[in-house]
Amino acid sequence: IFTPEYAEKESGVKADMIVEIAHKIGEAGERFASHNWRAAGASNLGGWAVARCLHFLTVLTGAVGAKGGTSPNSWNKFKPTQPNPPAPQKKWNELHFPKEYPLAFFEMSQLLPHFLKEGRGKMDVYFSRVFNPVWTYPDGFTWMEMFSDETKFGLHAALTPTWNETAFFADFVLPMGLASERHDLNSYATHGGTWVAFRQPVLREAARRNGKPVSLTYEANPGEVWEEDEFWNELSWRIDDGTMGIREHFMSPYRPGEKITIDEYYQYTFERVPGLPEVAKAEGLTELEYMRKHGAFLIEPATYKKHEQEGWPTPSGKQELYSKTIV
């Protein structure tokens, strides 16, 4: 029954136009590039199938991972290696990932205040990070109601770069840095290669270059704005005296038993960027010094057809249009 005429009836697109598009896609072959960014996949009954069908066209033309085709964005993004990472969680908070939505890929935070209101549980301590649900979500009034009830949110700390509606309902408002006030790694799927860039807090780096280094970023930032990484390091060491299994994930990889610093964190990461140690050494620099100086590093100029060697991260190692795992 799946004819061009049937598709016209379902979609409103003329049958002859559908046939013409199909021929053009076939002619493009491996140079067919397309993907579904929300669009019909969001808020439509059966919309989840749109991305599957569109990707199947890429499969049929052999364009998956090909030059001029469509690649997984993870092929073009650098994934950093962190010191002392915790083991994956063995269970989840059903206030964030409710049983009603077993295939949810992201935390369904828009439902949280409604679950609290139903009496499903309590958030003893809640950090809202660069997040303004009172304004952003459709039912901001329920968030306001729950934030005002200490039996639902015991303590609410808002980590935010701005004063906003959600911060108004917080017990603590903790100013977080904007782009020029913090360290970050950047790596985006901008083209067929893979790269990593290093964002640095401007005033801290300026102070270091002028011979006036600081220990913590907030000492250089206006308004004592904290570096998030340092905030979590400090908070974790204050929460855990070493008996709770938290502090061990915030230890220096170079000074056993000591608290990790922001410089050590990024030095550890950059030491493990493929090709960077050799390039930095050629300039007489450490990996961190190289990234401070240059700001970016090209890891791979092109990343095509990796699946031919690595397969896919599915039970079968193949792309699964029909998946026994989901069924």
Regions found by a protein language model. Give the residues of each.
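Short connector loops at secondary-structure junctions
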Residues: V64-N93
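Disordered, low-complexity tails and leader-like regions
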Residues: P83-P88, L185, A302-Y304
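Intrinsically disordered low-complexity regions specifically enriched for long asparagine
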Residues: P88-L95, Y101, G317-Y322
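Structured loops at beta-to-helix junctions and adjacent beta-edge loops in soluble globular domains
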Residues: W37, L60, R129, P315, ...
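Non-catalytic alpha/beta scaffold blocks inside enzyme catalytic domains
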Residues: I1-A33, W37-C53, T61-A66, S74, ...
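Conserved hydrophobic/aromatic pocket- or pore-lining residues that grip, position, or stack substrates
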Residues: L57
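Long, low-complexity segments enriched in small/aliphatic residues
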Residues: R255-V327
